[in-house]
């Protein structure tokens, strides 16, 4: 049975209570209060829903992750990086990045990054929890992504691209930055060909929970300069 959350309690059900079909649906309801969002990521779940639906909380099994040391950069992408076609920045324009990620796409109906979702993550950004990566070309924002940093873990949320390889360049730059700072895992949530081409792979929900337990409160070993 699906658990419905109240607005006065930030506790989530155990991850092993998530449904098998649809895969990983753990709970519904609640709100997007920053304290609840932080509690959700610490617990191992994330919000994902469409306009008109209640807030749905997910913990899929398996979970798609990328270990920084397993980052794969193809020859063509390495060439693009060497050519320095793009400028990459951190936290320069979080709002523009999340709005671009929320924009309609040809291959999808609607967006799950609703206006309340955008406002909630902007608040997390103001609190220093959520971060953005911007990719610029000739002064124009052409790619980027955003996510949350907790302990030695980074939780990726969404990315966008308006130029060939722009989001990949932003992602690779972020992964290298996190690796140098001592991060051990990047949560990619759900599988995509794009992410698998960069080295992402699936691990069990149990293994993901082990990473959470071990690293969510452990400070990075290096300097993280967002």
Swiss-Prot record:
Function statement: Functions in the N-end rule pathway of protein degradation where it conjugates Leu, Phe and, less efficiently, Met from aminoacyl-tRNAs to the N-termini of proteins containing an N-terminal arginine or lysine.
Family matches, as InterPro entries: Acyl_CoA_acyltransferase (IPR016181), Leu/Phe-tRNA_Trfase (IPR004616), Leu/Phe-tRNA_Trfase_C (IPR042203), Leu/Phe-tRNA_Trfase_N (IPR042221)
Localization per Swiss-Prot or TrEMBL: Cytoplasm
Organism: Pseudomonas paraeruginosa (strain DSM 24068 / PA7)
Alphabetical list of NCBIfam families matching this protein: aat (TIGR00667)
GN (gene name): aat
Full protein name: Leucyl/phenylalanyl-tRNA--protein transferase
The organism's taxonomic lineage, starting at the top: Bacteria, Pseudomonadati, Pseudomonadota, Gammaproteobacteria, Pseudomonadales
Gene Ontology biological process terms from the UniProt entry: protein catabolic process
Record keywords: Acyltransferase, Cytoplasm, Transferase
Catalytic activity: N-terminal L-lysyl-[protein] + L-leucyl-tRNA(Leu) = N-terminal L-leucyl-L-lysyl-[protein] + tRNA(Leu) + H(+); N-terminal L-arginyl-[protein] + L-leucyl-tRNA(Leu) = N-terminal L-leucyl-L-arginyl-[protein] + tRNA(Leu) + H(+); L-phenylalanyl-tRNA(Phe) + an N-terminal L-alpha-aminoacyl-[protein] = an N-terminal L-phenylalanyl-L-alpha-aminoacyl-[protein] + tRNA(Phe)
Similarity comment: Belongs to the L/F-transferase family.
Short name of any one Pfam family annotated for the protein: Leu_Phe_trans
GO CC, any one term: cytoplasm
Cysteine disulfide links: none
UniProt keyword Phosphoprotein present: no
Entry annotated with the keyword Transferase: yes
